Design a protein with these regions (language model features):
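Glycine- and aromatic-enriched mobile tails/lids
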Residues: 1, 70-71, 75-86, 102, ...
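Conserved redox-cofactor binding core of oxidoreductases
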Residues: 38-59, 63, 176-257, 262, ...
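Short hydrophobic core segments
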Residues: 87-90, 260-271, 446
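Conserved N-terminal glycine-rich FAD pyrophosphate-binding loop of Rossmann-like flavoproteins
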Residues: 116-146, 152, 311-314, 322-326
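A glycine-rich dinucleotide-binding beta-alpha-beta segment and adjacent secondary-structure elements
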Residues: 47-54, 60-63, 235-245, 249-251, ...
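An anion/pyrophosphate-binding glycine-rich loop and adjacent beta-alpha core
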Residues: 1-11, 296, 302-413, 417, ...
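Extreme N-terminal leader/targeting segments of oxidoreductases
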Residues: 1-86
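Glycine-rich loop(s) and the adjacent beta-strand/alpha-helix scaffold that form part
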Residues: 265-322, 326, 462-479
């Protein structure tokens, strides 16, 4: 059947689908579905890590190669400091900006280094909202329980408890900074319900939530005149030879020279791993999302958690080709949008958890009920015009202006026709193990945001990533700043790197790649 005919079927079946109520799967059905169809359960995509703190544990092959890869820094590198600071924050997204602002507020001398420009991050691409329990019908306890269930009960309880309890204070802080959250007709903060949540608790800024939060954070960093190094990518950490982190080596991307930063404490906020394109999946992540914190922390001895689980957002764009992998916000489903297969049928409760919805979409496509594009890709429909039908003309334009404009660039009107979607690599559920102050197992090395692990368990609920950034950016920055008041700078060495290389040489195939990779390689090979 032609694509246009399949699209017409979505319109023809809309009234019948509006009368349906799809129950959520039972726990047994969910487990069976995820085990059979979710990419986390493809054994061939995984292998054991050969050495280091996580030796013997399995992760995806792409990440294993990075963890076992060699540093680009030579053993005889000149470690004379070019910069000296109390707190070095690596990463210019939401977590990094929150960390540096709170460290600065506590009186520390701070330096923010970012691989690209300030604000170039996954944070600016977060559309769905930030989960914070602020209404009388909700509570941090309910937020805790929803997140624990969504994470398959594998969340670190203390990290989770801390996040949900500090949510309301984060909302207050963001409002004071000037974030323009959506409000209802009475001027109260408007909350929406997200997938896997039992209560409406999403605070939104249309479908620009992350961009709006990043706008005010970026402005505040600049207003506070915080020292900033842009286009300066961290490539190696420094230690004192006793297991403590004492700084980092950055690479100036303009001239390829190394910058040596002596720091009493280091906070890594380098974000996710999507640009590794795990298992060949497209990604919603920004160009610099190459998991840089993981190999650097690993070489220094930090333990990683839950690095065998990744989130594939259910609704990544499949058509047009220019948007492959781009996020189609969960907010569409939160406001009533249906997922529809090639037969014009709904097949999953659209507000189930992301792993369940993604697995259901993959099942439909693998069992022959997907829609094939003109370039051979498979997907299912997201019935976007349904929102205007249900809530009145102009609903999409008002609540999802970014998405409407994004598709209009390619001649597609999502207010009139549905869009094709398929899961896209979106988030690393695991990362560096941290405590409630964001500190790793390596003294004076902190990790905040997506680079850290333990908080989200084996599946993150929508809206929790932005809260994670704010809470653990704040806690890591504040803790690091207080600690440096009684510290002196430590010795700068690469002794940990020498030990890592010595161990790696015992294992065939190690040290073949350089890590961190910094940027994806999209160069087409000839021949």
């Amino acid at each position: 059947m032609q694509l246009q005919a399949l699209q017409d079927l979505v319109h023809k079946t809309r009234d019948a689908r509006r009368a349906q109520t799809l129950p959520k799967y039972s726990q047994a059905e969910r487990d069976t579905l995820i085990t059979k169809y979710h990419p986390d359960h493809r054994e061939s995509a995984y292998r054991a890590i050969k050495f280091g703190p996580n030796a013997g544990e399995k992760t995806v092959r792409e990440l294993a190669a990075l963890l076992e890869g060699d540093s680009p820094v030579p053993a005889d590198a000149d470690l004379t400091p070019t910069h000296s600071t109390d707190v070095l924050v690596v990463g210019g997204g939401g977590a990094g900006c929150a960390a540096v602002l709170h460290a600065h507020a506590h009186g520390a001398k701070v330096l923010l280094a970012t691989k690209l420009r300030l604000g170039d991050s996954n944070t600016v691409m977060a559309q769905g909202g930030i989960q914070i329990a602020i209404t009388n019908e909700d509570s941090p306890v309910q937020h805790f329980l929803d997140t624990l269930k969504g994470g398959h009960m594998k969340n670190d309880h203390q990290l989770l408890k801390t996040m949900v309890e500090e949510g309301p204070s984060i909302a207050k802080w963001l409002l004071e900074l000037g974030v323009l959250f959506d409000r209802d007709a009475d001027g109260n903060l408007h909350v929406k319900k997200g997938g896997g949540s039992s209560r409406p608790r999403l605070l939104t800024c249309s479908d620009y939530t992350g961009l709006e939060i990043m706008r005010v954070l970026k402005d505040e960093v600049l207003n506070q005149k915080i020292q900033l190094l842009e286009f300066s990518a961290a490539v190696e950490l420094l230690s004192d030879g006793q297991g403590n982190c004492t700084g980092a080596i950055l690479q100036d991307l303009d001239n390829k020279r190394y910058l040596v930063v002596a720091a009493k404490t280091v906070i890594l906020a380098t974000g996710g791993i999507g640009r590794l394109h795990i298992q060949g999946f497209p990604t919603s992540n920004h160009y610099g999302a190459t998991g840089d914190a993981l190999p650097m922390s690993y070489r220094l001895g930090a333990k990683l958690l839950q690095i065998d689980t990744f989130q594939y957002h259910p609704t990544g764009a499949v058509y047009p080709e220019q948007l492959i992998g781009a996020l189609v916000t969960e907010g569409i489903r939160s406001e009533g949008g249906h997922l529809v297969n090639a037969r014009g049928e709904r097949f999953v409760n659209e507000l189930d958890t992301r792993d369940v919805v993604s697995s259901s979409i993959i099942r439909e496509c693998e069992e022959g009920r997907g829609v094939r594009t003109t370039t051979g890709r498979l997907g299912v429909w997201l019935d976007t015009p349904l929102l205007d039908v249900e809530s009145g003309s102009g609903t999409l334009d008002k609540h999802f202006p970014a998405m409407v404009r994004q598709y209009k660039r390619y001649g597609l009107d999502i207010t009139k026709d549905p869009v094709l979607i398929y899961p896209t690599l979106h988030y690393q559920n695991g990362g560096v193990q941290i405590d409630v102050n964001g500190e790793s197992g390596v003294r004076n090395l902190f990790v905040a945001g997506e680079a850290s692990g333990g908080l989200h368990g084996r599946n993150r609920l929508m809206g929790n990533s932005l809260l994670d950034l704010m809470v653990y950016g704040k806690r890591s920055g504040s803790t690091a700043a207080e600690r440096v008041k009684s510290m002196k700078h430590g010795k700068l060495t690469l002794e940990h790197l020498a030990r890592f290389r010595s161990e790696a040489k015992k294992h065939a195939g190690s040290l073949e790649a350089h890590s961190p990779m910094l940027f994806p390689d999209y160069v087409r090979k000839e021949g």
